[in-house]
Amino acid sequence: MADDMEAVALSELRIAHGTIEARRAQTLRRVPVFQSALCRVRQGTKLLEWGARQARAGTHDVVLMPAGQELGVANLPDAQGYRAEVLSFSPALIARFRARHGGLVDTQLRQAATASLCVPLDAHAALAWDQLTASLASSTPPALLAHQAEGLLLALALGGHCGPLLLDRRDPLAARVQQVLLLDPGADWSVAKVASHLHLGASTLRRQLALEQRHFRAILEDVRLGL
């Protein structure tokens, strides 16, 4: 049975690679992210907007694109145009990485709601990226691809930059409340307004937060303080 479960799990550990190219500036608003992904700019600049926050990514950065997030993006060419690579990861691969490295990523997950989605790409992560994309272009066995993908995620996590990418729509309600509040931290938020965004009743939201030993006002204060 254990071997069967491992085989099924391996078949779900999928990685996809794509390239975005443009000669002229592109602006895309309210782009939904369906699978967790990373974007590495090779030429030009990417402007990123999520909630009330903004960031600029160049060739020494990587953009984290968490599943379930809605982003505004602008791709700005330089003299040679705009080019970026995108790697997307199946939910099963993200879940396995979280399970294997919980001790390392737990703090990053707690801080993910206020972390930037544009982070530095250090030498270790850049090398892991290049190895993974080279393997995806060849007939590399799926088990090795999954290992290399987790190596890239680990390189980002060791740099303290993996939290937002690992957020799951099945995460605790408090984390999802934080994401809603980050849409506009200074707004006049109420339990009812946040519950509406999450398609819950206000009493249900309060009750489920209480089960997690969290309180709406405390979460709101944390978001506004940037904790």
Where in the sequence are the language-model features?
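Cyclic nucleotide-binding regulatory module and flanking cytosolic helices
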Residues: 1-5
